[in-house]
Regions:
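ATP-binding N-terminal substructure of ATP-dependent carboxylate-amine bond-forming enzymes
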Residues: 1-94, 98, 117-126
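Active-site nucleotide/adenylate-binding loops and adjacent lid/helix of ATP-dependent enzymes
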Residues: 2-8, 20, 36, 49-51, ...
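Structural signal for conserved beta-strand scaffold positions within catalytic alpha/beta enzyme cores
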Residues: 38, 59, 84, 112-115, ...
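Short clusters of hydrophobic/aromatic residues that line enzyme substrate/ligand-binding pockets
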Residues: 45, 87, 150-153, 206, ...
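Phosphate-binding site of ATP-dependent enzymes
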Residues: 154-234
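Short, basic/aromatic recognition patches
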Residues: 237-241
């Protein structure tokens, strides 16, 4: 029987979601006759790995330390296969500003943006946005996932919403682009397909993703013309690779 170590929990703002992911993964793996152990990414992790001797490691961590190259660096040292992208890919993908710069260089469309520093830019934020972008805008942390602390802001409420992000030294501000929410799944070079998400809330935020009461509709397969579907998968694959 193959042994799988699931790492979940962690210290990010997505800890609760990570723990839930770990439990769900463990449940499914056990159904398929794997011997499973769940561990936290703490100082005991090294001992757990050495004693358990897993055949593979399932990274169920979300957010900082779990998706940004840190845990990947640690796992590389054990030379045990693990799920997730490698060190460099993880560190780049978790940084929204760096990712967008790479997209722009490779001619992949991405919303216009600017970075915002609380120590330098707060007084002139409205003027800067009106000069370089236009309202409404989307504000978000540079290196969080799961739509944690993501807000759509108007000129009227931008300063109020910024207060929720004061713990971050820098954030990213993007132009708002309305429309349908389509997500494409890529693993390696394989295109798995796309789905449409129809949230009942203002947009596909943290609550829409994880609160069952939000009743977000998942449409599979996505209802799109073939040409448009192929275009989405092509762009997604280019961004991924």
């Amino acid at each position: 029987m193959k042994k799988i170590l699931i790492i979940s929990g962690g210290i990010s703002k997505e800890r609760a979601i990570s723990l839930d992911t770990g439990r769900q993964v463990a449940k499914e793996l056990k159904k398929n006759n794997y011997f499973v152990k769940i561990a936290e990414p703490n100082f005991q992790l090294f001992d757990v790995i050495k004693k358990f001797k897993p055949n593979k490691i399932f990274n169920a961590l979300h957010g900082q330390f779990g998706e940004d190259g840190y845990i990947q660096t640690i796992l590389e040292s054990f030379k045990i296969p693990y799920t997730h992208s490698g060190v460099i890919s993880s560190s780049i993908a978790m940084d929204k500003v760096l990712s967008k710069k790479i997209f722009i260089k490779n001619k992949i469309l991405t919303p216009k943006f600017l970075t915002f520093s609380f120590s330098k830019d707060e007084k002139n934020i409205v003027r800067t946005i009106e000069k370089k972008l236009k309202f409404p805008v989307v504000i978000k942390p540079i290196n969080e996932g799961s739509s944690v602390n993501v807000f759509i802001c108007t000129k009227k409420d931008i300063k109020k919403k910024l207060k929720y992000l004061e713990d971050y030294k820098k954030i990213i501000i993007e132009e708002f682009i309305g429309g349908r929410e389509i997500q494409a799944a890529i693993i390696g070079s394989k295109k798995l397909g796309a789905i449409e998400l129809k949230p009942k809330r203002k947009f596909y935020d943290y609550q829409a993703k994880y609160n069952p009461k939000a009743k977000t509709e998942h449409i599979i397969p996505v209802d799109l013309p073939k040409k448009k579907y192929k275009q989405i998968m092509k762009i997604s694959s280019k961004a991924h690779n």
